[in-house]
């Protein structure tokens, strides 16, 4: 795989584009914002979403979806609730057989569909893979050691994608359990918010440990009910992602919930927030 397209010019999309460049690929990054494209192409930074990181001058950004879709593999890094719309916009430009690598974590609110199902509906000609695991974009961009799950039903394609993205500091581990990888990446966000609440209310480390452990058990049961395998949830895209997101102040879900819970009156505002 010589050329990789990346759809999404946020922190994670930019970090993945930089990783693919380090792996020796030609990379075109699509961003919605013209100022982000200009920042990347002219100043070789993404000051809006990934400040403080110098980008490879050979990394090229564009506002043209067709340009980014003209690749040997395309990473879909738009926010989960907008991923279907992004795939629909890409469909006229997509060549049959080009893999779509889902790099966004979540479950579609309007349909309760996994990202895999949403993308398959819009890009039926695309083989699908999922990239998910314990990753903060800033650490990946800095080249700090990172391991991640790459799930793909086709073993040969999976190996090609691992080779296309893997570097000395970014290690994809191949799996064929797309469902398990997606459930882990989505549900850990809910548990991270819950752990932030535990921290904010001063309920202690015992409570957080219990929440992570029992949350993992529920996450595993959900994955199995959807056709995933329990061992996937014990790996990088399950337990690994959960530990990272539910215990670090770099986690947006955890860091949002903790101060909110500290300040919120109990219990009336909780019901309001849930609604």
Curated annotation (Swiss-Prot):
What keywords sit in the KW lines? Cytoplasm, Lipid biosynthesis, Lipid metabolism, NAD, NADP, Nucleotide-binding, Oxidoreductase, Phospholipid biosynthesis, Phospholipid metabolism
The subcellular location is: Cytoplasm
Cited InterPro entries: 6-PGluconate_DH-like_C_sf, 6PGD_dom2, G3P_DH_NAD-dep, G3P_DH_NAD-dep_C, G3P_DH_NAD-dep_N, NAD(P)-bd_dom_sf
* E.C. code: 1.1.1.94
Highest taxon above the source species: Bacteria
- List this protein's GO terms for biological process: carbohydrate metabolic process; glycerol-3-phosphate biosynthetic process; glycerol-3-phosphate catabolic process; glycerophospholipid metabolic process; phospholipid biosynthetic process
The record's active-site residues are 188
Q: Which Pfam families match?
A: NAD_Gly3P_dh_C, NAD_Gly3P_dh_N
Q: Which pathway, per its entry?
A: Membrane lipid metabolism; glycerophospholipid metabolism
Q: Where does sn-glycerol 3-phosphate bind?
A: 105, 133, 135, 188, 241, 251-253
Cellular component, GO, one term: cytosol
State the similarity comment: Belongs to the NAD-dependent glycerol-3-phosphate dehydrogenase family.
Q: What is this protein called?
A: Glycerol-3-phosphate dehydrogenase [NAD(P)+]
Q: What is the lineage of its organism?
A: Bacteria, Pseudomonadati, Pseudomonadota, Alphaproteobacteria, Rhodospirillales
